[in-house]
Curated annotation (Swiss-Prot):
Disulphide bridges: none
Entry GO CC: plasma membrane; septin ring
Keywords annotated in UniProt: Cell cycle, Cell division, Cell membrane, Coiled coil, Membrane, Septation, Transmembrane, Transmembrane helix
NCBIfam families, sorted: PRK04778.1-7
Keyword ATP-binding found: no
Function statement: Negative regulator of FtsZ ring formation; modulates the frequency and position of FtsZ ring formation. Inhibits FtsZ ring formation at polar sites. Interacts either with FtsZ or with one of its binding partners to promote depolymerization.
Superkingdom as given in the UniProt entry: Bacteria
Gene of this entry: ezrA
Source organism: Bacillus velezensis (strain DSM 23117 / BGSC 10A6 / LMG 26770 / FZB42)
Primary site of residence: membrane
Protein name as it appears in the record: Septation ring formation regulator EzrA
HAMAP family (alphabetical): EzrA
Sequence similarity: Belongs to the EzrA family.
Length: 563
């Protein structure tokens, strides 16, 4: 029983597979059949009828015959063959010869693809032929008009073209021959070939029109404009040389000879080769070179004006600075009698004198070159501007040095004024301590007071010396200011602290009779207080009172700050 069921299952599976493959093949057969019918229904004959208005000779006749033969072959040979193969594929599918059926279908697809490609090629060639005829029919009149216009212009302005007239006329004759060739090919039915001939004449007319438009100007440039520019530049060069300008470094005469040869090259490119682009490029380069030469000459003139105006000014400024140097040197010697100058200040004076010597030497060299015959202004201006910069730096350095000399007296007066202020601060601090009834001054404060007085006395001593060493005096003065500021602040803090200790002890006295421990602590605080150990006295008193009345110390501080 199980064997029977197994066989039935296998049979059903085989039947299902066979059904699936047959259906797939039938679907492909239907697709190929539809494609075949679509090809058969293509309007090739209708498309071919579009050329009936053309002359059926030459290329057109050859094309038409070939297209008709190819279409007949598709209809009478390829498509019947496809029909036969479709029947074979269907028969193979019915007999479950699926592999054979698929091979036949692939072959059919190849045949239909080839037929489709062949048809597309025919349609494309038909379109090209018809389009060529239509475009040429529309463009030939434009070409004739352009030809006529070019010939009229050439005849009307023949005198502008000189030796090129015959060459340009020959080109026009060749274009006319090309137009005639176009007409002959069109009459012979060779529309595609005629199209190529027409496009070539159109291109040649474009080129010829460029020649007609550009050649007169280029010839005028070669024969008149550029030679005149070269002559004018040569005259300007000669005139500047006669006025004393040194222009050997520019080498204009040699360059102008080269430009003259370049003009001949441009003219030859036009007359012998009819190469407008080459001639234009050469003339453009010549124009750029001429402009560059003018810029160099103008630069030489500007440099000359600048040199001739700056040199007298620099000489005057140098001589004035020399006079100031002598006065400053005398002033420096006078200052040295009263003040000790630092090594840096003395070095600045020596450096300034050397710098001035260098500037004088450079000025003399520049003056010699200016009086000579072989140095161009454009080269000399760089040296003059460098001297000008050095002179400005020397003037600035000298002014700063003079200011430093004058500042020494100001620094001395400022130092003496500061000393008076420091002495007053110390005196005020001592008076404040005395009025505050402080039991005594701690050793730390005494030491700082002594240190401050020491630096003050050292500063006074330095200020009394001749020559005065202001740098050393300033060091002692800075130390004195620092120490006086510290001791003044500490003295103020000391007075505040003493008053606070007294208030805390007074506040704690109310608890003495009731609290023996507090009484002993306050007694110790008083001992420390009169021993000038104010920090320890504060800690002892504050600790005792805070234990007896928490928060009392904070309140006492607040009351003291408010009073």
């Amino acid at each position: 029983m199980e064997l029977v069921i197994g066989l039935l299952v296998i049979l059903l599976a085989l039947f299902a597979a066979g059904y699936f493959f047959r259906k797939k093949i039938y679907t492909e057969i239907d697709r190929l059949e539809s494609w075949k019918i679509e090809i058969l229904n293509r309007s090739i004959v209708e498309e071919m009828s579009k050329i009936k208005h053309l002359k059926m000779t030459g290329e057109t006749e050859e094309f038409f015959e070939r297209w008709r033969e190819e279409w007949d072959e598709i209809v009478t040979a390829h498509l019947p063959k496809v029909e036969e193969l479709l029947y074979d594929a269907e028969e193979n599918a019915d007999k479950y010869r699926f592999k054979k059926a698929n091979q036949v279908l692939v072959h059919i697809d190849d045949l239909l693809t080839a037929a489709e490609s062949n048809i597309e090629g025919i349609l494309r060639e038909i379109s090209d032929l018809v389009t060529s005829e239509e475009k040429s029919r529309g463009e030939i009149e434009q070409v004739r008009e352009r030809y006529s216009k070019a010939r009229k212009n050439l005849l009307a302005y023949s005198h502008l073209y000189g030796e090129l007239y015959n060459s340009l006329e020959t080109d026009l004759d060749e274009i006319w021959s090309g137009i005639k060739e176009f007409e002959e090919e069109t009459e012979s039915g060779n529309y595609i070939k005629a199209r190529k001939v027409l496009l070539e004449q159109d291109r040649r007319l474009d080129q010829l029109q460029t020649y007609i438009d550009d050649v007169p100007k280029l010839l005028a440039d070669c024969k008149q404009t550029v030679p005149n520019q070269i002559a004018k530049l040569k005259d300007g060069y000669r005139e500047m040389t006669e006025k004393g300008y040194k222009l050997e470094h520019i080498q204009i005469e040699k360059e102008l000879d080269t430009l003259t040869n370049q003009v001949k090259r441009a003219e030859n490119a036009l007359l012998e080769e009819l190469d407008v682009d080459e001639a234009s490029a050469i003339l453009q380069l010549i124009d750029e070179t001429i402009q560059s030469m003018y810029e160099q000459l103008e630069g030489e003139v500007e440099a000359g004006q600048s040199v001739l105006s700056k040199m007298p000014e620099l000489i005057i400024a140098y001589e004035k600075l020399e006079e100031e140097k002598d006065r400053t040197k005398t002033e420096t010697e006078l200052v040295k009698e009263s003040y000790q100058l630092t090594a840096g200040e003395i070095g600045r004076q020596h450096a300034f004198e050397k710098q001035l010597e260098t500037i004088g030497r450079l000025l003399e060299q520049a003056r010699e070159k200016l009086d000579g015959e072989h140095v161009a202004y454009s080269l000399l201006i760089e040296e003059v501007e460098a001297i000008e910069k050095q002179l400005e730096e020397a003037q600035k350095e000298h002014a700063e040095y003079r200011e430093n000399l004058q500042a020494l007296r100001k620094e001395e007066l400022q130092a003496r004024e500061t000393l008076m202020h420091l002495r007053k601060t110390i005196s005020d601090t001592a008076r404040m301590l005395q009025k505050s009834n402080v039991p005594g001054i701690p050793e730390q404060v005494k030491d700082k007071l002594e240190t401050a007085n020491h630096h003050i006395e050292e500063t006074v001593s330095q200020l009394e010396e001749l020559p005065l060493n202001m740098e050393e005096a300033a060091k002692h003065l800075d130390e004195a200011e620092k120490v006086v500021e510290e001791v003044s602040e500490e003295a103020e803090d000391l007075v505040i602290q003493v008053k606070l200790i007294e208030r805390i002890i007074q506040y704690g006295n109310r608890f003495r009779s009731q609290n023996h421990i507090l009484s002993e602590q306050l007694k110790e605080a008083e001992r420390l207080f009169y021993a000038y150990s104010y920090n320890e006295a504060y800690e002892m008193a504050a600790d005792a009172v805070e234990k007896a009345a928490p928060g009392a110390v904070k309140k006492i501080k607040a009351d003291q700050s408010a009073s």
